[in-house]
Amino acid sequence: MAVRIAVVIGYFVVLLGIGFWAMRRARGTSEDYFIASRTTPPLVLFLTMAATNFSAFTVFGFAGAGWESGYAYYPIMAFGTGFMALTFVLIGRPTWRLGKEHGLVTPPELVYRLTGSPVLRFLFFLVMTVFTVPYLAMQPMAAGYALESLLGIPYFAGAALITVVMLLYTFRGGFRGVTRTDVFQGGMMIVLLVVAVAIIAGRFGGLSSAHRAVMNDFPELFARPGLGGIYTPGVWFGYMLLWSLCDPMFPQLFQRFYAAKSPRGLTTTMSLYPLLTGFLFLLPVTIGVLGRLSFPELPEGAAADRILPLMLAEHAPPAIEALVLTAALAALMSTLDSQLLTLSSMFARDVCEPIRDRFVRRRGTIGRSSSSGGLPAWVSKAFVVGLALVGLAIAYSPPATFRVLATQTFTGLAVLFPTVVGALYWKRMSPVAAIASIVVGEGLVAAYYLDLLPRFGTLPVVPIVVATTLVLVVGSLLLRTEPRYEPTWEPRALSRRAIAGWSVAFAALFAVGNDVWNWGDGRVSLFGFPWWVWMFAGLCVVTSGLFWLLGRALTKGRRDNL
């Protein structure tokens, strides 16, 4: 127990130290506090984007899904999330340019700048906040699981402890503190998950032997649609689409588009992302699959999300167990801190400042703050504390497994995707039609949550996004909106022929990722993994290569037309 306590305390000390170090480098402006004065270099941007996106869901949720349904979960997440990185250029590059030109910091500010609609701006803030809170709640939930297993402290006490530590270093260091802790925590998570897989597999004679033992009793874990028949081709397609639509709408990811030092950081991040997802996501899923050897059935009252700490407690030495579960804490804290910092900036800049500008005209009525654009620091920080308490309240009585909770959250955010793309690329998009599309979309999310509508053999996100896009397009055409702004995309960076060629290439890649012809194929290959696991790992490499070539083409095209 002493070793475990020392590991956890040491980890907290490092995080708080990074936060205080970042505070000393702060420049004392709102832009610096929230996006580090747009100076984040490419490698740091890549690591903070990854660490922010890979949350408790990545560690605990993926392992739980591996235990429940098998390796069918890996391609959905690895290739689907890697392919999603294409939006780092499609949305990220024009967002970065507009942010730099106009001093934008938050996602709703971008929408307001492009449409001039304060109602649409507030609606974006509301949707992003409402649908981030359940995802935010996953992080203290996972912290409670980890510390309960690690130190034996009560589940909710562990959740509260992690939340307090995270608030301390976030308030001190701002975005600089968050990105530097992301680099530390992301690297720690990757290394220690590799260690965990090696130790657990070693207890069963290596990966090949362990996989053979699992396959004898649970062959469905090595084929699609997976144990329980969850991942039918329609559901598979729905998940693949969901990640591309929802991930760039995470407010904490969206805000990082502004933080890049240059567009090169976004293209570098896009190129490296599929390589990381292809490697990293296999690790927790493998732990979950091997968990069937020790826990064919879970202990009474335990959800599948608990399989990782259960396996570590069963097979790992105390020091390794402490380090790996601390890596899991790293994953969840790197997401939680970013979520709260971004929501803090949105509350300050998209709610408080517009209200102040409208109703408070006399100079000096509201005190100045270096970190919230003219508002008292306690205003945005109090909002963050309130959100953290809401997350803890949800964690106190968790409503579902991480996977179920995440899917609901992601669908709500995906509704915003058509409006963002329309605002960036369609000059005649109507703000009124955009508002209507979001209201209709979130109404459909509620209807699907209540099981009032048919699913058509796929995830709700597919019919919902089709409906919201139709409302947006038809409404804009009927309202005949006048052009509002100049195009945000560098129109000469790629020729129309090149754009068509790239579109065909990525459409073909996405189609290969929906390989319905391989359903039911349970053949195994190297180290006992299903052969199609290696196929999707290869697709992640191909995707990375195509992204790199696209980045080069964009850079060359831009230079040629200067």
Model-derived segments and spans:
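Membrane-embedded helix-loop-helix hairpins and adjacent transmembrane boundary segments
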Residues: M1-R523, P530, G538-T543, W548-L562
